[in-house]
């Protein structure tokens, strides 16, 4: 092998090594920042790493919303039809937030309570987020509840 060929081979190997390292770093960063959607049943069953950040999806249980006067601290429960999980947040809730509506909350589990740092609510009476509709559909089929097809956007 001539010196020119050897030098080219070294550069090619260095380029491959650098691109492999960059790919691995990007994959690790994305994995740390990804937040999977779970239902209350999956959380209570232990399908979620207690230390990880994730999204909780379901319906706000009617009669569960509580916010002390003059406080941003809100407490409510989310259900998927099988189980209920208490949620607390100190953030401003969206205008469309209401009991009996679909929500997706992002946060962490602490002492059996989901502490949300973001709460998203549906934006009209027909809309349910696709991931929530799919997971709620499983609970509906399990309990023989007729499933109405939500408008998915």
Curated annotation (Swiss-Prot):
Entry keyword annotation includes Iron: yes
Domain of life: Bacteria
Periplasmic side: 30-153
Membrane topology reported for the UniProt record: Single-pass type II membrane protein
One Pfam short name: CcmE
Annotated transmembrane regions: 9-29
Localisation per UniProt entry: Cell inner membrane
Name of this chain's protein: Cytochrome c-type biogenesis protein CcmE
Lineage: Bacteria, Pseudomonadati, Pseudomonadota, Gammaproteobacteria, Lysobacterales
Gene: ccmE
